[in-house]
């Protein structure tokens, strides 16, 4: 497979079943072509949108942005797949703001996300990019008062970003109109098309007045066969963007494991079971000079154990899990983003979509089941974002290696045993 040259990147081919864009394939020409551009000016974007783009430091489009923005502007459905941290949110936000008519006091863009944290981050990106355009953005999600959402919708937002449950509720009580939707964005689409969200997403889609004409854009780092099947029911002649970099090997992230061999033979509870992992983690913290890191573990109960143990050993950290209120989670994230705390313990809420700029290392204290293998990709994708280098360390027992190796084979990636003399510098 050849790497695409800069000249070849300018065009991709359109087929009768849709358009497919792959970064590391020869691009075959066809009668109709979609143009990709190297600079923001080349897109012919609104002047005030360009100001917003440059004000937040977007110097040039990333590859996913090159591939996705123009098809959306041209009115095409798209299904985009790209590794975490490549600029997917910026891609659909820029395109949406370009096609949105700010002179119309109606909601034209609807963006769904699986968690409030991701929805809030997406809404903030729209606000930042649209700050010179007069773009009005409303965030609708569980955990906030219904009354506050009603007030937000009374301001006639151009763009609504939210979680499926709250968005559906606001539609049902006639507070959110679907009469003028131009673009329906499904972020973290692999999660949104799973059984837990799928019916809500379909229900919301059915409520869009002009659903035969509305554009749909799906973005994710992973899709499985069932999710692809569901997407085919919704999308019409889509542009398919697949930028996974050789079957999900996450570019720029070095992946390692530490094999602790047998789990403790005698234990009274979960802390005893986790103790060898906690000691190993603490030893790394003490001996290495690390920037900020995230520690992932599957359950909120285990996350609390890890947090309490580190606090008892006087290691500065933060905890974010489902046991916290929404307000507490937001305060925790804001503190951590602001540089408070060396590490953040997460039960999984942060494995998707959340962007923490200065994160250098991700630690995984357990391995997701093979059925939830995409969780691994989303976890380690918190490091190495936007082309920066990252490190992922899996601290595991012998029996967990089977799952880790199965994930390694499935994604055609490399997870090495951590060398004894490894330096995080």
UniProtKB/Swiss-Prot annotation:
Motif Q motif in this chain: 38-66
Domain Helicase C-terminal: 252-425
Any GO CC annotation of this UniProt entry: cytosol
PROSITE patterns: DEAD_ATP_HELICASE, HELICASE_ATP_BIND_1, HELICASE_CTER, Q_MOTIF
Domain Helicase ATP-binding, residue spans: 69-241
Residues involved in ATP binding: 82-89
Subcellular location: Cytoplasm
Entry's EC annotation: 3.6.4.13
Superkingdom classification of source: Eukaryota
UniProt domain comment: The Q motif is unique to and characteristic of the DEAD box family of RNA helicases and controls ATP binding and hydrolysis.
Quaternary organization: Component of the eIF4F complex, which composition varies with external and internal environmental conditions. It is composed of at least eIF4A, eIF4E and eIF4G.
Descriptive protein name: ATP-dependent RNA helicase eIF4A
Source species of the chain: Encephalitozoon cuniculi (strain GB-M1) (Microsporidian parasite)
């Amino acid at each position: 497979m050849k790497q695409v040259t800069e000249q070849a990147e300018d065009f991709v081919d359109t087929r009768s079943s849709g358009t497919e864009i792959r970064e590391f394939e020869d691009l075959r020409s066809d009668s109709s072509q979609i143009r990709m551009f190297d600079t923001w000016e080349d897109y012919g974007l609104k002047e005030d949108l360009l100001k917003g783009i440059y004000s937040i430091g977007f110097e040039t489009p990333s590859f996913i942005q090159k591939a996705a923005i123009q098809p959306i502007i041209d009115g095409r459905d798209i299904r985009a797949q790209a590794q975490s941290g490549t600029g997917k949110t910026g891609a659909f936000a820029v395109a949406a703001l370009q096609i949105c008519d700010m002179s119309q006091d109606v909601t034209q863009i609807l963006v769904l996300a699986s968690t409030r944290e991701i929805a809030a981050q997406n809404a903030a990106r729209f606000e930042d990019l649209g700050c010179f355009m007069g773009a009005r953005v409303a965030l609708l999600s569980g955990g906030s008062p219904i009354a506050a959402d009603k007030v937000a919708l009374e301001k006639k937002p151009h763009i609504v970003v939210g979680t499926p449950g709250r968005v559906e509720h606001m539609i049902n009580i006639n507070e959110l109109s679907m009469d003028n939707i131009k673009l329906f964005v499904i972020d973290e689409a692999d999660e949104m098309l799973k059984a837990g969200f799928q019916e809500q997403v379909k229900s919301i889609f059915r409520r869009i007045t002009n659903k035969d004409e509305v554009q749909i854009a799906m973005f994710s780092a992973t899709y499985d066969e069932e999710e692809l099947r569901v997407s085919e029911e919704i999308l019409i002649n889509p542009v398919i963007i697949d930028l996974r970099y050789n079957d999900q090997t996450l570019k720029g992230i070095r992946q390692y494991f530490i094999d602790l061999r047998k789990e403790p033979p005698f234990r009274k509870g979960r802390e005893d079971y986790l103790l060898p992992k906690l000691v190993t983690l603490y030893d790394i913290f003490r001996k290495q000079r690390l920037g900020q890191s995230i520690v992932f573990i599957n359950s909120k109960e285990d996350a609390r154990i890890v947090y309490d143990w580190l606090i008892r050993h006087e290691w500065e950290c933060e905890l974010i899990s489902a046991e916290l209120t929404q307000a507490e989670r937001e305060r925790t994230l804001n503190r951590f983003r602001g540089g408070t705390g060396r590490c953040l313990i997460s039960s999984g809420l942060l494995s998707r979509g959340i962007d923490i700029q200065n994160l250098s290392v991700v630690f995984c204290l357990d391995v997701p089941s093979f059925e939830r293998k995409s969780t691994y990709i989303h976890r380690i994708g918190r490091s190495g974002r936007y082309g920066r280098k990252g490190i992922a360390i899996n601290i595991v027992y012998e029996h967990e290696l089977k799952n880790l190796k199965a994930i390694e084979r499935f994604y055609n990636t490399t997870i090495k045993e951590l060398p004894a003399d490894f330096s995080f510098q």
